[in-house]
Amino acid sequence: MGNLFCCVLVKQSDVAVKERFGKFQKVLNPGLQFVPWVIGDYVAGTLTLRLQQLDVQCETKTKDNVFVTVVASIQYRVLADKASDAFYRLSNPTTQIKAYVFDVIRACVPKLNLDDVFEQKNEIAKSVEEELDKAMTAYGYEILQTLIIDIEPDQQVKRAMNEINAAARMRVAASEKAEAEKIIQIKRAEGEAESKYLSGLGIARQRQAIVDGLRDSVLGFAGNVPGTSAKDVLDMVMMTQYFDTMRDIGATSKSSAVFIPHGPGAVSDVAAQIRNGLLQANNAS
């Protein structure tokens, strides 16, 4: 701003305050303004109408006794029609704004637990903005926006919170892993059950085919060889199967088969036991 031939230049987005012998005269708008110094007029100071930002750090304690540092960002500007109030009524507007911010934050945060402070930071910012706007408008300042840009707990508390979050994530991961293993085991059991069912069907069909073949063999042999009975044919078939079994067991060195008495007479004894068991079952039914 210059002062030449009783004229001053007020820059764009600024206003100047003119006084005469120490008394307020008027607010000078941007442009070339006439200030006759010969009659005691002079420019007492200037104010910017630009948007200004003030970051305020406030340390306080939550309801659950955790110390936190809350950082609030205040965006404000001077009201052009109240520039004289902004110039004369406040000697240090930033100090006044900080005082209101401290007052509101320290009134709101102690009512909330730490987790609630993070969740309700927008409500805290709104409370600060409403209180500031109500107070600062009378002094010629407009509060445009208030933001809570950071909430910083004590370092030990922050470390504990990180450990709690890590433990919670590990619990979730362990639960998901256990659920996956459970599904795998269920599917494996279902597969084994289906496999055993199909294997049982195959064994049943195999045994049915064996029974049908034996029946046909017994009937055919008894019909073609006079003097033989069905019992004689069954004894001969069982003896043949016995020797086949002995051959299969001896073919491997790691057989886990249960070995029953192997004398030739034992086959007849086993056959007799089977027949007696069948007869007893038929009589009982």
Curated annotation (Swiss-Prot):
Organism field: Arabidopsis thaliana (Mouse-ear cress)
GO process annotations (BP): response to oomycetes
InterPro entries cross-referenced by the UniProt entry: Band7/mec-2_domain, Band_7, Band_7/SPFH_dom_sf
Annotated protein name in UniProt: Hypersensitive-induced response protein 3
Chief place where the protein resides: membrane
Gene3D superfamilies: Band 7 domain
Coiled coil location: 113-139, 165-185
Subunit structure: Self-interacts and forms heteromers. Interacts with NB-LRR class of R proteins before R proteins (e.g. RPS2 or RPM1) are activated by the effectors.
Disulfide bridge map: none
Subcellular location field: Cell membrane
Lipoprotein found in the keyword field: yes
Membrane topology according to the record: Lipid-anchor
Lipidation positions, renumbered (N-myristoyl glycine): G2
Tree of life domain: Eukaryota
Keywords, alphabetical: Cell membrane, Coiled coil, Lipoprotein, Membrane, Myristate
GO cellular component, one term: plasma membrane
